[in-house]
């Protein structure tokens, strides 16, 4: 049972405004306002809009035939979501926290969330309209890494030492199967977070870490990256060293053959790699324990060549140019498709992997998924860059159908935080053609507002506007979610966003627990839309953000134009707050006009639409009147959002 939360009068007003926006214009009422202690039922949007649904309704019961752009995705790190089995909190490892990695008071250690807990909350996730789950990495990790005083754990899932097993802190392989089957039984998809760039930190370099090393080239200040030019594969130590690996032709695309890599037999071209005693068999599958499958060039600088060949914070960087690594990774992740019937992959550190790897790996995954009866297998890469031109390289050249849309995140943050006018959207959306037809010009890109790396959207807006009230921060955060639901792309909700979480930083600081937290640096955060803290269980289906997401996702689900339709710019303002765009139903030709006021004052506006569109029907907010052919007049409250549908198909777009 979820306790009723006390919220302020202004927060109740915002919630009421959201409900009014969903149904139609708010009208005066003589009824007394409900007390703060009275739980309010969430608006039933599907019922309200049933008469206005497109004739091309989507069958949401069949997750296999549903195309990815029709989904709303919910993302979580399992360790931070729900603890369904406290007996696995230490993963079965003996010793203290530096052995098993469990310390729920420390933001950098395991907290106890697991697959049983996640399975128990599937109806909560589905209730907000999510139809797909992006599951953070669940593989067995090295429990603890880091030097003395800098230790943290692999709770996040990205320090893998067994690519075939579920991390025992999270549960078992059987419990993963139970979770996926339970999601599928609800018509929900599961996208698994995968890593091909690196493994856990096992390999060391004698020049840096071996206390018995006496060589003149002993390193005292970290293992700095050593480049291909200064430390080629064919000499030992540096370019002036003795010849090794005779006949090896390098690792460019046309030399990535088994015959060529068979000549790469000595691996001390840059550093002298070794596996510390006791860790010789630390990784699974067994082939990952062979030093020859890693670059062994030292720490990345995150720039240039080192971003492909360097170790991230000591993590062992896989030689993804090596054909046996390519084949090995293909075999590993085919297994996750076969055994668990995953519906797609989110692919970590995409830009740090050899591009030719993707041209082999991605088609192999699609082909295997189709063979397993998964025709709409959805893969999206992580390329941490807000520049659409940089992102589009991966769809145009490297073979990705989708990449996470960091450009969308940057544009929405700039506008909704007040940094720029709405003309920022012009510059962003004009780049959609760069992505190509594979993404349907951006319509299949996963869009998001914040995540576990960069931090939460609400926290970023607060940092940009330190004096902003909690009520205004809630209104801006709601509006940002509304824009994400109705603009092109596949919306991704980061767990906790729907409960008003406001991180006070990025990475570890933005990975709060949904179940009652014992982490002081989380529990002192001031959440929006509630008086609760992260010290409580935060699965409140009456939270204004949960309700807003549920309401807007219901509208999106009822009208395929809002997921599949072409997006047309209608209005932006330089240094202004108004933004309008249309989505066109690809089957019926109906035009949907979405208008937002991203400002603190009411606005009245005339918006030009297609001359064939007429008699706008209200799906959300107030839709005003047709002033004349092709012009609609609207009034929007502060942070207001309206969604309007033409009653008749446009003559221009009708089929």
Describe the role of every protein-language-model region.
Residues 65-71, 79-332, 339-340, 361-365, ...:
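Substrate-binding/active-site clefts of carbohydrate-active enzymes
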